[in-house]
C-alpha cells in the first residue's frame, strides 16, 4: 500500500504553480495525495484578523457534510468558514487546484495501482499522466463519463460556496434544498461522492485512462508496448465486479468465461520488479463471479447503508463504504480468476 499525504490549500504564500510542484513531487514518488481546503477556525492563527489582513485571505462559507438536522421543527446546520483565496492565490487558481484534486484523488484509489505500475514502467511520469488526463477531459471535443463527472464536480465545488453564513443557512432551509441535502444530492464530501460515482462506471473510466495513455503518449510507445497497454486494459476491464455488487440482477451460477491476452499482465503485476520482456507471451485466464462474495457484500452494504439508513442512491452508499472499508484492499471487488496457460 502506498503512503498517503495531505495538502491544505491555499496556505499563505501558496500559488497554483507551487501547489502543482508539490503534487508532482509526491505523485512521482508514489505518495497518494489528498487535498483539503483551509478552514479559518475561530481562535486559530489563520482565523484571526491579523493573519487574514496580512495574507489577503478571502473567505466563503459551506456546509459540513452530514452536519445538519431538524430539531423541534427547526432546521439546524453547521457551516464552516473556509479560505478560497489569498494575495498569492486567486479564487480562480483555488478552483483550478480544487478541481484537479479530484483527478488526483481518483487516481490514488488502489484500484488504479496497476495503472500506476504500468505507466511508471512505460517511463511516463504519473504526474504528467494525471495532467494529460485532466487536459483531455477538459477538452470540449472529448466526451465520456469521466468528463461528465469532472464537470459536475467543478459545478458543485463552485455552488457549495456562499458569501455569508446566513446566505448558506437560508439556502439550505428551503424545503426543496433541504430535501436535496437529505438525499445526498448536495452538501456531500465531493471527493468521496465523485470517486464513488467514477468507480460505479469503472469500465468507462478505464476507457478514458487508456485512451490518454495510447493517444497522448503514443510517441513514447513501441509496438510491443502498445500490445502491453491493450492487454492491460483488457484485463482490468474484466477483473472487477463492482457493477454486479451494486446491480439488482441475479448472478447466474455458471458464469465462467475466458480471455486471451498477448501480454500476461496479471502475472507481471503480481511481481515486484520484473521487466516486461519476461511476460510478453500469449496467456489465457478463466474468470467468474464469486457469488457468495457478491451476495455477502450486497447484504453488508444494504444493512449498513440501506435506504432506511438515509442512503437513497448506490453511489452515496458506495462512497461511504469506500471511505470506511477500503483498507481491506481492492481484492474484495475482484472476480475469481485462474491462469489456464
State each model region's role:
Residues 26, 101-104, 157, 209, ...:
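Hydrophobic, Leu/Ile/Phe/Ala-enriched alpha-helical segments that form helix-helix packing faces
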Residues 174-341:
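Charge-dense, extended regions
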Residues 1-129, 133, 252, 258-286, ...:
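A structural motif corresponding to the C-terminal lobe/cap of the Radical SAM core domain
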Residues 95-205:
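C-terminal non-catalytic alpha-helical accessory regions
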Amino acid at each position: 500500500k502506498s503512503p498517503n499525504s495531505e495538502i491544505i490549500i491555499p496556505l499563505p504564500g501558496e500559488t497554483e504553480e507551487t501547489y502543482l510542484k508539490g503534487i508532482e513531487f509526491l505523485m512521482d514518488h508514489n505518495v497518494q495525495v489528498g487535498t483539503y481546503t483551509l478552514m479559518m477556525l475561530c481562535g486559530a492563527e489563520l482565523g484571526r484578523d491579523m493573519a487574514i489582513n496580512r495574507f489577503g485571505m478571502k473567505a466563503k462559507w459551506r456546509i459540513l457534510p452530514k452536519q445538519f438536522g431538524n430539531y423541534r421543527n427547526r432546521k439546524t446546520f453547521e457551516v464552516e468558514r473556509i479560505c478560497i483565496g489569498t494575495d498569492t492565490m486567486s479564487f480562480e487558481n483555488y478552483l483550478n487546484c480544487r478541481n484537479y484534486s479530484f483527478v488526483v484523488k481518483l487516481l490514488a484509489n488502489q484500484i488504479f495501482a496497476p495503472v500506476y505500475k504500468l505507466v511508471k514502467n512505460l517511463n511516463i511520469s504519473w504526474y504528467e499522466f494525471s495532467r494529460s488526463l485532466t487536459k483531455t477531459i477538459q477538452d470540449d471535443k472529448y466526451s465520456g463519463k469521466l468528463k461528465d463527472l469532472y464537470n459536475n464536480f467543478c459545478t458543485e465545488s463552485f455552488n457549495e460556496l456562499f458569501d455569508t453564513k446566513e446566505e448558506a443557512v437560508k439556502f439550505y432551509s428551503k424545503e426543496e434544498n433541504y430535501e436535496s441535502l437529505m438525499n445526498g444530492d448536495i452538501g456531500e464530501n465531493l471527493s468521496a461522492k465523485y470517486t464513488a460515482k467514477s468507480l460505479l462506471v469503472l469500465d468507462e473510466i478505464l476507457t478514458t485512462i487508456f485512451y490518454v495513455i495510447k493517444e497522448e503518449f503514443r510517441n513514447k510507445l513501441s509496438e510491443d508496448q502498445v500490445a502491453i497497454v491493450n492487454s492491460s486494459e483488457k484485463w482490468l476491464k474484466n477483473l472487477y465486479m463492482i457493477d454486479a455488487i451494486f446491480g439488482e440482477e441475479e448472478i447466474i451460477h455458471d458464469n465462467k468465461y475466458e480471455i486471451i491476452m498477448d501480454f500476461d499482465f496479471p502475472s507481471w503485476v503480481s511481481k515486484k520488479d520484473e521487466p516486461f520482456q519476461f511476460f510478453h507471451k500469449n496467456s489465457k485466464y478463466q474468470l467468474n463471479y464469486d457469488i457468495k462474495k457478491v451476495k455477502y457484500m450486497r447484504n453488508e452494504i444494504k444493512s449498513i447503508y440501506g435506504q432506511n439508513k438515509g442512503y437513497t442512491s448506490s453511489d452515496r452508499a458506495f462512497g461511504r463504504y469506500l471511505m470506511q472499508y477500503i483498507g481491506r484492499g481492492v481484492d474484495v471487488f475482484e472476480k475469481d480468476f485462474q491462469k489456464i496457460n
